[in-house]
Amino acid sequence: MRKQTLLRTLFPALAVVAALASTACSLEQNDYCPGTLPPEPAPGERPFRPGDRYTDYGENPFVNTSQAPVSTFSVDCDGASYSNMRRWLNHGQNPPAAAVRIEEFLNYFTFDCPEPAAGHNIALTHEVAACPWHEGHLLMRLGIKGKAIPDDRLPPTNYVLLIDVSGSMAAIDKLELLKTGFSMLVDVLRPTDNIAIVVYSGREEVVLHSTSCEEANKTKIKEVIASLRAEGSTAGAAALKTAYEIASRYFVTGGNNRIILGTDGDFNVGISSTEELVALVEQERERGIYLTVLGVGSGNLNDSMMEQLADNGNGNYEYIDNLAQLEKIFIHERSRFHTVARDCKVQVTFDPKAVAAYRLIGYENRLMDDEEFENDNRDAGEIG
């Protein structure tokens, strides 16, 4: 066999997983619906707002298989980077390089992968083809697809909506967008699902104790959501603790226990460093309570913190830029809020006789030491 020059590029379409129980995505780049939110500005109309915060993880280099034939990394089911990139382009600007996480561009879309066999939670696929941007190289795509669960067979859910109502959320593409999305979610939930709502600005407040989503209660729940207003500073850490306390109080054994945090990530009261907040969610995740993070807005978007909170909180991170994205998250791909596999890791071993070198595309902040693959105590990504 002729040895491939330099590369068998590893392109893990683990992102395929992100769509696991969802219908195919057919969403286009959409403006906000007339009369509800303003249309997107014309290219260049909105000035650059430099307050967004990203972490630049660099780019994975080529690795010689003679020196390190094994590639090990955690799965990642976030999709925020793609819709955030779309927001930048719709505003006539290029996104910062640090805002681009390639694996999340794949996660955003649904791929036509085979369903898992009976009795299995995931299915594995792979493809190898000529690399379209480098002649003589090969591109390998790995696919992992989670088990599809019909809505009527989803386990009961204990949701705690944790909503940022601080002054920074007053922009029309922040709190109002989240309120619309959460109302959509209420409409599709079942009587076996419960919702509690915690809000925070200068202080946290429980505005709705855990309530069954029976039809008779849905109007009340949506009225609470509609009444929310943005004002004050941002005491996010204290509210996060309160949300975990409520989720624990109403914990559903064998169910889906999840906090959904909607914010721009601008925590400025109490614990505010990413490291301290990550330590908090790491303490809580072992109790079986997962954290989904929904980012909104621009100008002070703390993408770096929100991605780390979701990854370490056994959840996922999405960015919402328009109403079509709300429908995608809360209606068409609601199954992402249900985890079907925990602590998922991937390890690929290349034969140095056939492959000279490889490069993992994306997953720069999900790399693992090879020996961690067999370590069940090492946290990794969830499929949901």
Q: Where do the PLM segments sit?
A:
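Alpha-helix boundary/capping residues
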Residues: 89-92, 109-112, 228, 313, ...
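C-terminal motif of bacterial Sec signal peptides marking the signal peptidase cleavage site
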Residues: 21-24
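Extracytoplasmic
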Residues: 96-111
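Bacterial N-terminal signal peptides that target proteins for export
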Residues: 2-13
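Sec-dependent signal peptide cleavage junction
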Residues: 26-44
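Short helix-loop boundary/capping segments at the starts of domains
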Residues: 12, 19, 91-95, 111-115
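An acidic, Ser/Thr-enriched
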Residues: 38-88, 93-99, 116-127, 132-140, ...
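Exposed acidic/Ser/Thr-rich ligand/metal-binding surfaces
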Residues: 27-33, 124-345
